[in-house]
């Protein structure tokens, strides 16, 4: 089914200023710790099973960076949320990393981990697994030290604005690489808004630069504490089409089907996609 033919998910707002405002309002009830428990603690956060969703995401990222083609000086993580796992393999390839999120509570959660404050979420199992699959002999402590040292700033972002980081951003632009995990589909009222958000973040990337995009397939809602948040359902083909429309060559697109034992009632996700895309141009 093409984007033009897709019927909006039940409860989804129309693609309009009011629709985007409704999304922003719903996110004011977002609870970072509940989100982390739902998705990054067991069972979904169990990294002992190599067929689990966590190992799959980490392998996709590690294998892509291992090609040596995705490198440079600057990287921007779009819509980081309260998570850092998406940068564990990236941090050895980029010396200047910018993390971003729309919500202050998520930026605060990231700050606690970056400053090693008591009570910060423990990502050590993810760091250990990333070191294991990279096979460089690096300790997880060294991995985390490097990531903390290379994250230079945590900034507000609004992917629905033509200038997502605003004017006069301290982030070096354009970036050599963008990473984004579970952001665009989770904050877009419909596919048209998803496409525009992708267009907007693409302005932050240099021609020839790379985008690594992770997201939910065919998901319409998820829970984060008291918040029940609407998601625009996307298919693998719709992701591919959106990337091409935004001026990318799709280098790799993989999918993971969520097994029954990981369908825990915190969302209705059917699977996960990982896309590696390169912005056309020199």
Curated annotation (Swiss-Prot):
Q: Which SUPFAM superfamilies match?
A: S-adenosyl-L-methionine-dependent methyltransferases
Provide the protein name: Phenylethanolamine N-methyltransferase
InterPro entries, alphabetized: NNMT/PNMT/TEMT_CS (IPR025820), NNMT_TEMT_trans (IPR000940), SAM-dep_methyltransferase (IPR053384), SAM-dependent_MTases_sf (IPR029063)
| Described purpose of this protein according to its UniProt entry | Catalyzes the transmethylation of nonepinephrine (noradrenaline) to form epinephrine (adrenaline), using S-adenosyl-L-methionine as the methyl donor. Other substrates include phenylethanolamine, octopamine and normetanephrine.
Q: Which UniProt keywords apply?
A: Catecholamine biosynthesis, Methyltransferase, Phosphoprotein, S-adenosyl-L-methionine, Transferase
The residues listed in the UniProt record as binding octopamine, with positions renumbered to this chain, are 219, 267
Q: Which positions in this protein are listed as binding S-adenosyl-L-methionine?
A: 35, 40, 79-80, 85, 101, 106, 158-159, 181
Give the metabolic or biological pathway.
Answer: Catecholamine biosynthesis; (R)-adrenaline biosynthesis; (R)-adrenaline from (R)-noradrenaline: step 1/1
Q: How is its activity regulated?
A: Inhibited by p-chloromercuribenaoate.
- Any one GO MF annotation of this record: phenylethanolamine N-methyltransferase activity
| Broadest EC class assigned to this enzyme | transferase
User: What organism is the protein native to?
Assistant: Macaca mulatta (Rhesus macaque)
Please spell out the taxonomic lineage of the organism that makes this protein.
Answer: Eukaryota, Metazoa, Chordata, Craniata, Vertebrata
UniProt lists the family membership as follows: Belongs to the class I-like SAM-binding methyltransferase superfamily. NNMT/PNMT/TEMT family.
Q: Which GO terms describe its cellular component?
A: cytosol
UniProt cross-references to PANTHER family, sorted A to Z: NNMT/PNMT/TEMT FAMILY MEMBER (PTHR10867), PHENYLETHANOLAMINE N-METHYLTRANSFERASE (PTHR10867:SF18)
């Amino acid at each position: 089914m093409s984007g033009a033919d897709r019927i909006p998910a039940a409860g989804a707002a129309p693609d309009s200023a009011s629709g985007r405002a409704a999304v922003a309002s719903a996110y004011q009830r977002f609870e970072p710790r509940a989100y982390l428990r739902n998705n990054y603690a067991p069972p979904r956060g169990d990294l002992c099973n190599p067929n689990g969703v966590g190992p799959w995401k980490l392998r996709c990222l590690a294998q892509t960076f291992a090609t040596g083609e995705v490198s440079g000086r600057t990287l921007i993580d779009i819509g980081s949320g309260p998570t850092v796992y998406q940068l564990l393999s990236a941090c050895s390839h980029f010396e200047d990393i910018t993390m971003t999120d729309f919500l202050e509570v998520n930026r605060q959660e990231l700050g606690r981990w970056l400053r090693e404050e008591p009570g910060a979420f423990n990502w050590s199992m993810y760091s250990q697994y990333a070191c294991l699959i990279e096979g460089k002999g690096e300790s997880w402590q060294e991995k985390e030290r490097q990531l903390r040292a290379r994250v230079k700033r945590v900034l507000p972002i609004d992917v629905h604005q033509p200038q997502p980081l605003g004017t006069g951003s301290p982030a070096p632009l354009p970036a050599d690489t963008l990473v984004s995990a579970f952001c665009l589909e989770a904050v877009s009222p419909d596919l048209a808004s998803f496409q525009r958000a992708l267009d907007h973040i693409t302005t932050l990337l240099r021609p020839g630069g790379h985008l690594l995009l992770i997201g939910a397939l065919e998901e319409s809602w998820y829970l984060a504490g008291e918040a029940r948040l609407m998601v625009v359902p996307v298919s693998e083909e719709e992701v591919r089409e959106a990337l091409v429309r935004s001026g990318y060559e799709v280098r790799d697109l993989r999918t993971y089907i969520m097994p029954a034992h990981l369908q825990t009632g915190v969302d209705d996700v059917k699977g996960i996609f990982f896309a590696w895309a390169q912005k056309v141009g020199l």
